[in-house]
């Protein structure tokens, strides 16, 4: 198998260029009732003007037809082959909220959910506020401390999300998610995928029943779905591989966790897109690579809220000048996967990609949307090749071979 990162590392010639990777989570979509996607419907004069000066294309996050999770989707655009580096959502969420994870620990991402009888009727418990969710996490910590010889600790995340950490001997992460992924389905318990994870299966399934018992009197957050069981993985450092000083700007814990896992510096920022873009400006001289994450495009796609997804795209466009005035040598606008509103979830569809640089061919595309990207100069490429293009457009790659 070709080791892309090793080849790139040998070709890199550092310079003073600056690269910005703007990820609008779940940006790709399919036409709605009026025949337009949210990107087409949105009023985006800055993105469209940028498209005229850029090379456009689309990415395949993992393989054609494969629907990626957020972890594989991001690893791909960071240049890590998601088929080689398989990482559970739990470790990403845990690192994103600064949970310390050791070699005896097994972590999982939790969603508070609403249960009627044994049927999941809301996988996100009505999207409670982070403050409401934290109170329920406290109830869990007060009532569940240990299962057999395994210590249990819960940590609040953002909105309906939390992290559970199990600490003990012989815990492994080859496990199915304890999440049916759809509403209207019964409780799903985890199942070990190999013999080494049988103990983990037993402990987690007892834990699920304990959570159900403890939360039975809660109105909406009366159950929890657990997924992304994971140990701490070791990944090559992004900075070392690409000879860059990388920084990450994200609001949601999981994406901070992803960035931290590959060795990016996590910058403090506010809650809005404007705050995030201003954080880039404030730190412009300290780093030469900025990963900026916008979450709500994905959230509204999952909710099936077409108009709200349009508004988030327009908010990105409204504030894009904050990035453009910095005059980055390379500005990449893309997503980690598609989240069509009609499907209310991640999908297999290719992801729009736009790369701005003074070295682009430009001239073919007039707008930034799925269909302009599909016919763009970059073609359809694996997401794992985005970083090599970023480095090339930044003038950081030497010639390969004689």
UniProtKB/Swiss-Prot annotation:
Signal sequence region: none
Keywords, alphabetical: Glycolysis, Isomerase
MF terms (GO), sorted A to Z: metal ion binding; phosphoglycerate mutase activity
Encoding gene (name): apgM
Pathway: Carbohydrate degradation; glycolysis; pyruvate from D-glyceraldehyde 3-phosphate: step 3/5
Family indicated by similarity: Belongs to the BPG-independent phosphoglycerate mutase family. A-PGAM subfamily.
Catalytic activity: (2R)-2-phosphoglycerate = (2R)-3-phosphoglycerate
Name of the protein in question: Probable 2,3-bisphosphoglycerate-independent phosphoglycerate mutase
UniProt source species: Thermosipho melanesiensis (strain DSM 12029 / CIP 104789 / BI429)
Top-rank lineage group of the source organism: Bacteria
Function, as annotated: Catalyzes the interconversion of 2-phosphoglycerate and 3-phosphoglycerate.
EC number of this enzyme: 5.4.2.12
SUPFAM superfamilies assigned to the protein according to its UniProt record, in alphabetical order: Alkaline phosphatase-like
Entry's Gene Ontology BP terms: glycolytic process
